[in-house]
Amino acid sequence: VGTMICDGKNWILAFIVGILIGVIVGCINGFGVAIMKAPSLIFTLGVNGILRGLMFIYTDGADVNNIPKSFKDISAKALPGVRLTYYFIGALILTIIIHLILTNTRKGRYVKAVGDNADGAKLVGINPVATKFVSYIICSVMASIAGILFCSRIGIVTTSSGNGYEMTAVAACVLGGISLTGGVGSVIGSAIGAVIMSSISYLLVFMGFSSDYNDAITGSILIVIVVVDSVMQIRSRMKLRHERLQARTRDD
């Protein structure tokens, strides 16, 4: 998108191309994970590596740094009288819409059901393969939109842009209450987790720490939360098992 805009192409065309690339990537991820049953983390990281290689080839390793100011203003302009940028307002509205879809529509609830127990969801008539496939497409489209806004906000795109963001995204989701095993959490919680992670980064800069600390702190937060989540799941399973044993004892 950045190279097309810098080359004078129509913005709408550039946006459409960016979204279509997201759809294609989502289809690839959905095919690999939902249909071929490949491990989601390994497969998506592999696709990420391929895309970074293709980006390097497409740009010939050069930075995209002559992005027009008018495009950068998209993420900088704010509503008159308030200090809220259109960038923030758009993200907030999109978060609320997706949250409402996932919690108040049948298809949205299917996503959580498949994440919680794919086999159980299949027994009640939900197609887990189709649900996962579509979910990967939607996630990739959201990532495309985020990439376009990142380009507008930063004003420069390098071959290393976005490196490490996947770990930050995972940490934000887990911090917001998303379970790595699926079926638990909400979009609102993930958004709050993202705000907290961003606040930590800004706080480090404000305190005079180098940005090199970001990855270490993000990794530490992720490890702590995952360990706590695992302990809570183990305790929950043990409690459920204990209740079942008590019920059987009473029946006997």
Task: List each language-model region with its residue ranges.
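Membrane-interface helix caps of multi-pass small-molecule transporters
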Residues: 4, 23, 27-35, 54, ...
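Helix-loop interface residues and adjacent transmembrane-helix termini in multi-pass membrane transporters
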Residues: 8-9, 35-37, 104, 130, ...
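Helix-loop-helix "hairpin" substructures at the membrane interface of multi-pass membrane proteins
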Residues: 10-18, 24-29, 33, 80-158
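Alpha-helical transmembrane segments of multi-pass membrane proteins, especially transporters
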Residues: 14-22, 40-48, 132-140, 160-169, ...
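Hydrophobic core segments of alpha-helical transmembrane domains in multi-pass membrane transport
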Residues: 19, 48, 52-53, 88-100, ...
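Transmembrane helix-bundle core of multi-pass membrane transporters
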Residues: 36, 40-104, 131-134, 153-162, ...
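Cytosolic-side transmembrane-helix boundaries in multi-pass membrane proteins
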Residues: 119, 123-130, 204-252
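Transmembrane alpha-helical segments in multi-pass inner-membrane proteins
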Residues: 143, 153-219
